[in-house]
Amino acid sequence: MKITNILSRPEPTISFEVFPPKQEAGLESVKAAAGAIAAMNPSFMSVTYGAGGSTSKLTVEVASDIKNLHNVPVMPHLTCVASSREHVRNMLSQIRANNIDNIMALRGDLPKDGVICNDYKHASDLIADIRSIDPDICIGGACYPEGHIECEHKSDDINFLKLKVDAGCDFLTTQMFFDNNIFYNFLYRIKDKGINVPVLPGIMPITTAKQLSRSVALSGTSVPERFRAIVDRFGDDPDSMRQAGIVYAAEQIIDLIANGINHIHVYSMNKPDVAKDILKMLNGIV
């Protein structure tokens, strides 16, 4: 099933993201976690892609398990910073061979060895190539309500986003944010630029202070005072911090749904217990 079909539904839905193991030795534990989340009947699941394509085989394997063993629609990620055109074609062939209808097209983070491929300069180039190879596949793209961490001017960031959509991107998923007003303002700004594809908000439940520090360092996401106070108060108490983080994420989701945003993507970090607790708090809403 295409994700655009899911996003056209009027009822609220929740989807989850998982990531593949860095080594094949961890594959079975990731499959087990993904299977546990799939059993919660999300609208779809996404599977990330290691820096420089380091986990491309495992990404497809986990995604195939979700789709073909658990019968949950799935969206594997594909990055282009270290990918050749031949590799992209091979990945698309593998994805289609596993009955998968969706792909998330990204530039991706630089690999640790610094080796890149110059076949694609931007995510928009990758999206255009995927669309030319497989006109029927559903393509997702990333967007950044506070601007990409590497982009100096927000206006430039939205111009790059317009290029993705014009290249054939069917819908967008946001980087995490902790203040819903930032997301609402972002929707107004992109609409003014003529970007009218569905935008799926990405919510990350923060369960430890360390997770917050790392996430902010990587993404540049701002932390509102209300959430900062929560981390300051509960950060040294693991159980309380976990619960407070889940409550905060659930409150974000409830506010989004109350304001007409019916489809939410949760960065569940391979943690079925977190996904389960989020859904428990949303019982009767989703």
Which functions belong to the PLM regions below?
Residues 18-21, 48-52, 77-83, 108-110, ...:
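Active-site beta-loop-alpha junctions enriched in small/polar residues
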